[in-house]
């Protein structure tokens, strides 16, 4: 996966259909497979990642402000003021994590695509994630700019370096690393207690979920990223790991992050459930109706039986809210493990108006 880049410019990120191409930061894009090539190019530009936790070295340097040297998740050494009181986020996942840490008052700017929580939309905008306005960023006088290896580019990082603005990059590859990354970010921003508390809560919820569904056989699913052409997820993506945590297993056994597959191959594997990520389930339902009428798709038993699971788009972002999406999918796939939950959570038993599908809450 990538430094979150799946588009050449922000004009490619405007949604035009409910079955939109999603990047792993959770932004929605209608463009073609050229987006995936950009991811590969971006990856090659980044330094080899390091899982070394940030190491604190307090430095006064003759000034009144204290600094700390940290090693970010791509192996870069960064010098950050402590505590970091003015933060700019260049990725939706980073914005969500800042809010989850309770540090939203320090967030002075974010991108046009930082839409969660809703309050984040009121922050000063610095443009898109791919080509942010360096002038706007500099005007905000940030102590640190938060970026991700999956979305932002090395050009942006180099430009920030030239302006003397430190940037800290994350690069989580699975759910455990997302939790660890949130904790580490709290430390980097000078709020270690908040980071530890957030990570502890997320891990506790994952442990509770494992106790509920760990002994149940996993449901075989197809995670649908894009319908035409049909694109799914690779087995080493953090989304695939999220599915496993929810008691599911992707039928696509590919090392590519975003493999294009054909329906005949899927028909041979016959997934039990098709999983879609969209926070606007009621708008998604009509499109599932159309999908269910297409002869090419009706070779799948899950389509004929309308075994669709629609969950929150949070599953697409390497941020704390992914745990909520995991819990959501687990309840839909394994309702028997959740005492007191309504039968409507079953894969084949939910409705949106007269439209039968599983809806994200």
Q: Locations of the language-model features?
A:
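His/Asp/Glu-enriched short active-site or ligand-binding loop at hydrolase and phosphoryl-transfer sites
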Residues: 111, 235-259, 278, 309
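Signal peptide processing junction and immediate N-terminal pro/mature segment
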Residues: 44-59
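Bacterial N-terminal signal peptides that target proteins for export
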Residues: 17-34
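Short secondary-structure boundary segments
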Residues: 91, 149-150, 225, 255, ...
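A short, structured surface patch at a secondary-structure boundary
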Residues: 67, 85-151, 156, 251-255, ...
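Extracytoplasmic substrate-binding proteins
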Residues: 63, 67, 76-77, 143-144, ...
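Short helices/loops that flank or line small-molecule/ion binding pockets
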Residues: 134-141, 163, 261-270
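Bacterial N-terminal signal peptides
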Residues: 30-44
């Amino acid at each position: 996966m990538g430094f979150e880049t799946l588009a050449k410019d922000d004009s490619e990120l405007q949604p035009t259909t409910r079955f939109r191409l999603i990047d792993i930061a959770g932004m929605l894009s209608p463009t073609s497979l050229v987006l995936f090539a950009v991811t590969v190019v971006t990856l090659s530009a980044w330094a080899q990642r390091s899982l070394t936790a940030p190491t604190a070295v307090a430095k006064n340097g003759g000034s009144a402000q204290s600094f700390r040297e940290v090693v970010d998740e791509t192996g870069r050494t960064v010098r950050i003021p402590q505590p970091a009181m003015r933060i700019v986020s260049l990725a939706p996942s980073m914005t969500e994590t800042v809010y989850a840490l309770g540090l939203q008052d320090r967030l002075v700017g974010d991108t046009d695509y930082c839409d969660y929580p809703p309050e984040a939309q009121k922050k000063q905008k610095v443009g898109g994630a791919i080509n942010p306005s360096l002038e706007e960023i500099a005007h905000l006088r940030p102590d640190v700019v938060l970026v991700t290896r999956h979305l932002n580019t090395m050009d942006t990082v180099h430009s920030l370096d030239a302006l003397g603005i430190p940037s800290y990059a994350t690069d989580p590859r699975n759910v455990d690393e997302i939790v660890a990354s949130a904790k580490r970010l709290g430390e980097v921003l000078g709020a270690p207690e908040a980071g530890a508390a957030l990570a502890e809560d997320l891990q506790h919820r994952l442990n509770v979920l494992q106790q509920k569904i760990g002994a149940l056989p996993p449901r075989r699913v197809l995670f649908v990223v894009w319908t035409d052409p049909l694109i799914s997820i690779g087995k080493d993506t953090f989304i695939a790991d999220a599915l496993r945590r929810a008691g599911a297993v992707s039928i696509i056994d590919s090392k590519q992050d975003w493999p294009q597959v054909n329906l005949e191959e899927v028909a041979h594997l016959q997934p039990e459930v098709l999983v879609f990520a969209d926070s606007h389930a009621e708008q998604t339902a009509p499109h599932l109706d159309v999908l269910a009428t297409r002869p090419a798709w009706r070779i799948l038993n899950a389509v004929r039986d309308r075994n669709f699971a629609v969950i929150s788009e949070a599953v697409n972002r390497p941020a704390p809210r992914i745990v909520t999406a995991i819990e959501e999918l687990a309840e839909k796939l394994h309702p028997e493990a959740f005492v007191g939950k309504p039968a409507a959570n079953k894969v084949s038993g939910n409705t949106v108006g007269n439209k039968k599908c599983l809806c994200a809450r």
